[in-house]
């Protein structure tokens, strides 16, 4: 209860089966899973695999073909690459969310110095999502803990740069970033 799926009997069963599978295969390292998030159908355009393939969104079917992902991908981190792929196969439907994204793109298009500064910091992060998943499953090695510290440290100047903007969408983005001060301090003490 409380995850917005109470009325979705089949969804609850599917989520339970997925958690059971993870528990069986990951040796009970699923305690980090604390929430269930539902992808709302009215927020995204839903496309089947046939449509995604025919539109060549992520992979080209031709010998010398180029997918839309290949054309657009100028990401500088694995996280950005995954996000762009997700955005292409699950495009937004809600006008406000689309406008927020466009406002961010417009801001960084007209403020190249700010964009360059963020790119440098994002490059320092590496694959923060992967590192976090390793922490959650207690499979992180010392070298990766050092990389985690670098990644979390890179969030601080990103928040500062975004907070200096007068763009509401950028300010909203800044408010969602957490440099995890307590975790960074704990890593420093190791």
For the regions a protein language model found, what residue spans apply to each?
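Charged catalytic and DNA/RNA-contacting regions of genome-maintenance
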Residues: 1-107, 116, 120-123, 127-136, ...
